A protein has these predicted regions:
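Conserved active-site-adjacent core of cysteine acyl-enzyme catalytic domains
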Residues: 708-842
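Core segments of small alpha/beta cavity-forming domains
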Residues: 35-99, 104-108, 139-220, 296-339, ...
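Surface-exposed, charged secondary-structure patches
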Residues: 25-31, 67-83, 94-119, 127-141, ...
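A short hydrophobic beta-strand element
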Residues: 140, 235-250, 372-378, 520-525, ...
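Short loop/turn segments that connect beta-strands within beta-propeller blades
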Residues: 335-338, 400-401, 448-452, 493-497, ...
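Beta-propeller fold detector
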Residues: 110-113, 281, 340-349, 405-413, ...
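Exposed beta-sheet edge and beta->alpha loop/turn motif
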Residues: 240-278, 282, 810-818
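N-terminal Sec-pathway targeting helices
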Residues: 1-16, 25
Length: 842
């Protein structure tokens, strides 16, 4: 063989050898630079109420904002004894201390250390005599601190000195009800509490008192309690108590495979001397996905089992990679390569740890590419790993080829997961330029993940002034200061960062309403039709809707009502439901609804969430895949975390002065808004309560059966000849020992709300719109009159209510107080646009 022939062969061999060496070295380096998440290390705290374990608390490694950490409430009796238990899981505990504060966190009530406690078999027991500093039946913040070496771990709760024996009976009953759900032979226990069967009989994912007793007792499923029930007291008040019970249920399916379910029971109970009343009972069950079980159907669908109807899932453009979130875990199913990858999970492969399974986080899938790489966001409480015990938002990239996860940013938060979810879950987006957008504290932020720089893109957003597309790619807003008088809407494409404007003439005002997919819906109103009543409430009657193609700003469809005006819309899929109003005697009132359709649903959709019926499980969910088939075999993988050599923390400075209202229902925050009226409606529908930013109750169902009409209600002398709006405001101020000329202030352009805010600085003024007369009696039960519009320029005060369905109405024109039924009052208030003003002491 000649030298010319040998030389190329040698070069090829050298190249191949070098390539192999490079690959081995690279793979070894990648292996060394990846790791699994560190195990959970933090202790768990709980309390004993008449020998029943309640109120399990999980630890935080940073001090949180205590006013945003409203969870369970610990009852203590007059003896002020508190029995505490801590599962240390091997952590050395050097010191345990606690602080008691007022609910707004401003006043320190007690600061003490637990001087004596036993520590045996990784369990600490302590009996504490709480200081005699708490007012009875008043909630306080309670913060425990466990010190281990140089590290502190914090635990947050509420505490109330109340009738501990009564609370114990409530807990005992809830536990008894829970135990009975596993007894199929004797169903007599439930007959007293069940309601008429009007609920869905074909589901075990959600059951309540309108379900069948068979559903309550798990039907034909061989349900078994796998973990001990975690019982929590969420609310204690004069009207009812709220208890939740969380546990893991196990069941062996027809194939002999064991399945696990996270189950929550919610009780709203009222206790009397004779019996316990179950006002509400609901149970939800969601299967914990296990890729080691059979989960691909014969048609290729991904079987998710019993779960809620709302699911987070996404596919790449080709439909070859399916990603989905189930009970806090992110999975990726690679169809072409026959792989199922557990991308992210706090749960270990073996067993169910109470710390790892504490499901106080959410995952949002941002994008999936053709290689199976995923951008996703994890927000909430971090159960283990680098950020164990922190609450925050983590931005992650999963490499579909290397099967590794890189943390690109972590944004810590001082609020609970529930509050974070209610506020930040509204807006999350990551584009291809590595720019991450999120909404917090009424502002839209952009974080450049390359430079870690932060920019506030839009600030001062308020309810009704903005909306986002379903994918969060498009964000539309008007200036909040000109929310009802803007002829320009800005629409930002977060993918490109570019903004375009929708603009009309000065005689037309615009309002962003929503999106159908990525198509933008906005309304327009004649400037002359937008009016404010004497109390300052603005009505925005829209004469038409426009649906805009965001890709080229072309108008796809316009809608003009055949009669009346558009008040608001709601979007469900490709259907827009339109609420219509018309003017009657100077006041706008609802006249019905209309619907329009935009584009047809995409018939070429690659995946969809479907349901089917099972003999034992009833309704089960699955992700159906177009053209799918069952693979011959499936490879199981678990992604590894990349070890970061740089700090990924992004510290956003939030405005603590922003006022928000939080709806707590069924043991969780279910809604957050700057609009008190929206919060009341949500709380009323969910049998919940409304809390403000200072942990103050600003609405609940009335705590008193009756309140006598307030005495000393009268306007001052300077306003006695004014109209009823002025005199009603004047009477509210006089009731609070404030004397000013309301006539002059309103004549100078101030609204009723402005006058009250400026002259009652120690009160939180609440401007209520669209609520009913039954909704306002809570404020009267707190000793506060309620201003109510009865026409465009007329008003009265509601000053009391009876136990037989009547309100006491103060008429400022004649100074008389008369009774009126709720029905008659609602008709009168309807003529005023259901507009009320009241206040709470700050």
């Amino acid at each position: 063989m000649s030298k010319k022939e040998i030389k190329p062969i040698v070069l090829i061999v050298v190249f191949i050898a070098a390539l192999i060496t490079f690959c081995i070295t690279t793979n070894k380096g990648n292996k060394d630079m990846t790791t699994k998440q560190a195990d959970a290390t933090l202790p768990v705290m709980s309390f004993n109420l008449d020998k029943i374990k309640i109120n399990t608390l999980h630890g935080y490694t940073t001090e949180m904002d205590p006013t945003k950490m409203r969870d369970c409430v610990i009852p203590i009796s007059d003896d002020r004894k508190l029995s505490l238990s801590i599962s240390t899981y091997g952590m050395a505990v050097d010191r345990i201390s606690y602080k008691i504060r007022s609910m707004d966190g401003k006043r320190l009530v007690a600061d003490d250390e637990i001087s004596s406690f036993s520590n045996k078999d990784n369990t600490i027991q302590a009996d504490i005599s709480m200081p005699n500093v708490m007012d009875e039946n008043t909630e306080y913040l309670l913060v425990f601190t466990i010190t281990s070496g140089q590290d502190n771990v914090y635990y947050y709760s509420r505490i109330m000195q109340t009738d501990g024996k009564a609370a114990a009976k409530v807990v005992e009953f809830a536990k008894k009800f829970h135990d009975e759900t596993f007894i199929k032979d004797d169903k007599s226990f439930f007959t007293t509490y069940m309601e008429t069967t009007t609920g869905d009989r074909n589901t075990l994912a959600h059951v309540d008192l309108t379900s069948t007793v068979s559903q309550i007792t798990w039907g034909s499923m061989a349900a078994a309690q796998y973990t001990n029930p975690v019982i929590a007291l969420k609310e204690i008040n004069d009207s009812y108590d709220v208890v939740t019970i969380d546990y893991v249920m196990s069941c062996v399916d027809g194939k002999g495979e064991t399945e696990y379910y996270n189950v929550r029971e919610y009780f709203r109970l009222r206790q009397t001397e004779s019996r316990m009343y179950v006002l509400n009972y609901e149970r939800t069950a969601n299967q914990i996905f296990n890729s080691e079980n059979s989960f691909i159907s014969d048609s290729g669908s991904v079987m998710l089992g019993i779960r809620s109807s709302e699911a987070e899932y996404r596919a790449n453009e080709a439909g070859s990679v399916i990603c989905f979130v189930q009970e806090g875990d992110l999975y990726s199913y690679d169809i072409n390569n026959g792989m199922i990858i557990k991308v992210f999970s706090f749960r270990d492969a073996e067993g169910i740890d109470e710390r790892e399974n504490w499901n106080h986080h959410d995952i949002k899938i941002v994008s999936v590419d053709e290689a199976g790489s995923i951008d996703f966001v994890v927000y909430g409480y971090m159960n283990r790993g680098t950020h164990e015990g922190e609450v925050g938002t983590g931005v992650y990239h999963y490499d579909g080829l290397a099967h590794t996860i890189d943390e690109e940013a972590f944004i810590p938060s001082k609020t609970s997961y529930e509050v974070l979810k209610a506020e930040m879950g509204k807006m999350l987006y990551l584009n291809e330029k590595n720019e991450f957008y999120l909404m917090m504290d009424d502002s839209l932020y952009r974080i450049n993940l390359g430079s870690m720089s932060v920019k506030k893109v839009v600030e001062g957003l308020s309810t009704g002034s903005y909306c986002a597309s379903e994918s969060n790619r498009y964000f539309a807003w008007v200036d909040s200061a000109n929310q009802y008088s803007s002829n320009t809407i800005k629409v930002m494409d977060l993918k490109s960062g570019k903004t375009f404007e929708v603009k009309k003439g000065d005689d037309q005002y615009l309002r962003p309403l929503g999106f159908i997919g990525e198509d933008f819906i906005y309304g327009q109103a004649n400037a002359a039709d937008v009016v404010s009543d004497a109390a300052g409430n603005t009505t925005f009657p829209m004469n038409g809707l426009i649906i805009l193609d965001t890709s080229d700003q072309s108008e796809l469809k316009t809608y003009t009502p055949s009669g009346g005006y558009v008040e608001k819309i709601s979007v469900d899929g490709y259907t827009v439901t339109i609420d219509l109003i018309a003017q009657n005697n100077g006041v706008y009132a609802e006249i019905g609804q209309d619907t329009i359709m935009n584009r047809e649903a995409d018939s070429k959709q690659k995946i969809a969430l479907d349901t089917s019926q099972s003999d034992t499980k009833l309704t089960v969910s699955a992700i159906s895949i177009a053209g799918g088939k069952k693979p011959d075999k499936l490879k199981q993988l678990t992604a590894q975390m990349t070890i970061n050599s740089h700090d990924t923390t992004v510290d956003l400075k939030f405005d603590d002065n922003t006022v928000h209202f939080y709806v707590y229902a069924k043991g969780d925050v279910i809604f957050a808004s700057d609009n008190i009226s929206d919060a009341i409606k949500q709380a009323n529908d969910s049998m919940g309560v409304v809390i403000d930013s200072n942990q103050q109750y600003v609405w609940m169902r009335a705590k008193k059966n009756a309140v006598n009409a307030f005495a000393n209600i009268a306007c001052n002398e300077t306003d006695k000849d004014a109209d009823s709006v002025v005199k009603s405001v004047s009477a509210m101020l006089t009731y609070n020992d404030v004397t000013v000329s309301v006539s002059e202030l309103i004549g100078a352009g101030s609204s009723a709300v402005d006058v009250l805010k400026n002259n009652l600085p120690d009160k939180e003024i609440l401007d209520l719109q669209g609520v009913s007369s039954e909704d306002i009696i809570f404020y009267i039960s707190q000793g506060n009159p309620v201003f109510a519009m009865t026409g465009n320029t007329s008003a009265v005060l509601v000053t009391g209510y009876s136990s037989n369905g009547a309100l006491y109405i103060y008429n400022p024109d004649n100074g008389a107080t008369t009774s009126m039924s709720y029905e008659d009052a609602d008709r009168m208030f309807y003529n005023g646009g259901l507009h009320f003003i009241t206040y709470m002491t700050k």
